[in-house]
A protein has these predicted regions:
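Bacterial Sec-dependent N-terminal signal peptides
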Residues: 1-25
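Active-site beta-loop-alpha junctions enriched in small/polar residues
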Residues: 40-42, 74, 107-110, 150-152, ...
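Conserved beta-strand positions in the central sheet of alpha/beta enzyme cores
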Residues: 70, 104, 146, 184, ...
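Active-site groove signature of glycoside hydrolases
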Residues: 136-158, 179-191
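A short, acidic, flexible beta-alpha connecting loop/helix-capping segment that sits on the rim
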Residues: 299-317
């Protein structure tokens, strides 16, 4: 009887998860621009970037005019180590006081970490970490955690690594379901980066609360054309609940070859610029989101060395440029 009741409770939570994050409706008229600022934008993670406390960031996001925020679930922002029950209650109240929506927590995981060293249950460790993030998310008043897949390690069969990602997502998804939380898998890490592979992965995971945080950045760097990116959005339509934007310029790199009195081409360095000033085609991408009736927020992040530097004033200018840019889609 106890087992039956537990199973029913888990099923109920899964049903709640399905409704917690709205999927694209297929109707363009249902699309609304809802803006979100990622706290990584003011977290001091790249050379010269200013650092704000969590409270300073919340005040900043409100003053700039964002509808919601995405909080990085690691130091120096919202780390599990630092946020006990009292701190969680205080932060939740502060977000409500400012009239902001906590769109999601940003988790930082890698399900293939340690795949080359047997004996350590790294996939379980990652899943437990994500489960704790789900509890943190619930305590703070959101029902979504952004997560990753895994980086591909050399000299380990790909399918072994892929299977760990599937296993990890299934374990993490079931833990997150206890708190009514959806996991949004971002197309960021190596495993299942391409949209066809990501769709296959999520189909295989087959949990109602494991969805996708699908961005324009990686398909562009994969070399997809605007039309192919549009079709990628359509492919991912059954899963997209979140997206994060950032724009970049390509800076070519060369090394001098003394023997040939010439230069050899190297991989380009990407540098962040205000949205609309780089090579990413966000008009095409956001219009594709509109066409599928996307229901989530459009987040903005400054997580790489930014043109103009990392001063508060320059970060603010770039954030405001994003808000101005997305007005055309309202």
């Amino acid at each position: 009887m106890v087992k039956r009741n537990l199973s029913l409770a888990i099923l109920l939570l899964n049903v709640l998860c399905i409704s917690a994050q709205k999927l694209p409706t297929g109707n363009p008229a249902d699309f609304k621009v809802k803006t979100c600022l990622h706290s990584v934008s003011y977290m001091g993670i790249w050379r010269g970037q200013a650092t704000l406390t969590v409270d300073e960031f919340l005040v900043k996001a409100k003053a700039l005019g964002f509808d919601g925020v995405m909080l990085a679930a690691k130091r120096p922002h919202v780390s599990l180590i630092d946020y006990d029950d009292a701190a969680r209650q205080k932060l939740r109240a502060r977000i409500k006081e400012l009239g902001l929506e906590l769109v999601c927590l940003a988790g930082y995981c890698d399900f293939t970490a340690g795949v080359d060293k047997a004996g350590i249950p790294n996939t379980e460790i990652q899943a437990i970490y994500i489960g704790e993030l789900a509890k943190l998310a619930k305590d703070l008043g959101t029902n979504m955690v952004r997560i990753y897949t895994g980086y591909e390690r050399p000299d380990v069969p790909y399918d072994k690594q892929y299977s760990l990602v599937v296993e990890g997502l299934q374990m993490a998804g079931k833990l997150a379901a206890r708190y009514g939380v959806t996991l949004a898998v971002q197309n960021h890490h190596d495993i299942a980066l391409h949209h066809d592979a990501m769709k296959w992965l999520l189909d295989e995971v087959n949990l109602p609360n494991v969805k996708a945080a699908f961005d324009c950045w990686s398909p562009t760097l994969e070399g997809l054309s605007p039309e192919e990116i549009k079709q990628a959005v359509y492919t991912m339509k059954p899963y997209i609940v979140h997206t994060t934007t950032a724009d970049y310029k390509e800076l070519p790199r060369y090394t001098y070859d003394l023997n040939h009195t010439n230069y050899s081409r190297k991989e380009s360095q990407m540098r962040a610029v205000p949205i609309g000033e780089g090579f990413l085609d966000y008009k095409n991408f956001i219009n594709a989101l509109r066409e599928i009736g996307y229901q989530g927020y459009i987040a903005y992040e400054m997580c790489e060395v930014l043109e103009g530097g990392g001063s508060i004033d320059n970060l603010d200018r770039s954030a405001l440029a994003f808000l101005e840019y997305v007005k055309q889609f309202r």
